[in-house]
Amino acid sequence: IHLMNINFFIIIVLMIFFYIIANYYYLNLSKKIDLLKVSSEHKLHKDKVCNNGGIVFSTFFIFFFSLLYLSNNLTINWTNEIPRPYILFIVFIIFFLTALYDQFRGLHPVYRLIIQITLIFSALSTISFPLSNFIPTKIEYLLVLYFWVYIINCTNFIDGTDGMMSITNLNLYLNIIIFTYLTGNFTVAYDVSLILTPLTLVFLIFFNFPKAKMFIGDTGSIPMGYINGFLIFTLIAKGEYFFAFAIFSYPFLDVTVTLIKKTINGHLPWARLYDYYFLKPVIQ
């Protein structure tokens, strides 16, 4: 195991450089194509804002992640850590393409859920089971499937105001990096976090910091929710149960409490009522 070789560092620097350029190009493109813009919720922005920055974000993540993986420049040997790591890439791409279709053509929430369940079922092979000594493995499969889909939607739901999802994701990635250095317990979650941290920081500081010039949209929040679930269950597979829950506890609890209240009041779970706790200071 090595912390970071020079090739890894160079590739990350190039990724940051080209990502900034690509995002500014996409930002300028949105000024010419109205389809790429959206009206801000809660009237936080006077004019329409460039939407679906996830098109650039997700494309850069999968390209540079694949480059590092195929050139053997990641910090650890993935094939020794998880079964069939290529499945992670394939499912990510399908999530991205599905979100892209949904954004511009529309998918019924039920169909969207069916697709998510199907893709996560395929991605279960990227997690090392069993996760515990007291739950039957088949029950673990079912629980991971359910909660992984839930993490995807938690990530998507908190993408409701400037910088919120970016900050939440940064909390996840930075905690994993710091925890890895402190414990010396290197996992694939560390590699993913090293790549996503600079991408997310650039997006937050240059494009998404209030008031945002760009929203990441479903093309970013859905694939990133999938990756967040992978990171969390990778930590759980290493026995880090409390840590895995703690670093994602706020969005999990906010969304869970809000959905329970919404259901009790007779609303569908996916109804856009803007009643999450993180939105209340903004709306007020």
Spans of model-derived segments:
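Short, Lys/Arg-enriched N-terminal segments with co-localized hydrophobic residues
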Residues: 1-3
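Membrane-proximal soluble regions of multi-pass membrane proteins
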Residues: 54, 247-284
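"…together with the soluble PPM/PP2C metallo-phosphatase catalytic core" -> "…together
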Residues: 5-256
